[in-house]
């Protein structure tokens, strides 16, 4: 790149900028903004994904990249009873979010939160829709039957997209590889998750 070239920039907060390079050296680049262009969100609500990180970091990084490309707003890691990973280097995940935002031409970088205790997280207020993805049968969760070791993968549960009210804020919990404990599912449901 050299002086006079036009470039496109983003602030990561919803704006694109058309700019012209005024000075380009090996160590820095100066530019002047020619035009600010707001970029509307694809989803008018706030989409928050809270998940227990997997043992394999590659999977977490892939999810962060793809979720950014799709267009979610916030990511929180949860420390659950069956979590195999108790620490996530959010600096690396943040770099992946920035890279995915640029690669997919998004104007917003998702908010990235540090690892949080599951019990404290589900007790926090959230005004929007709240969902928890789990593999238990509803009878098991309700305590009607003993939690089965052989959990059905669908359990007759509805698909998330069928349950979401378009344009409203939504918080989705995704558990660890061994699923949430049944106590965690019950606690989440007691706090309004479905």
Language model feature labels by segment:
Residues 1-38:
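N-terminal positively charged helical leader segments and presequences
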Residues 134-136, 141, 156-166:
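Strongly charged, low-complexity linkers/loops
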Residues 2, 73, 194:
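Short acidic/polar active-site loop segments enriched in Thr and Asp
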Residues 38-135, 142-145:
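RNA substrate-binding interface of SAM-dependent RNA methyltransferases
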Residues 148, 153:
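Short Gly/Ser/Thr- and charged-rich N-terminal loops/segments
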Residues 20, 160-194:
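A glycine-rich beta-strand to alpha-helix segment
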Residues 11, 79, 134-137, 176:
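Short secondary-structure boundary segments
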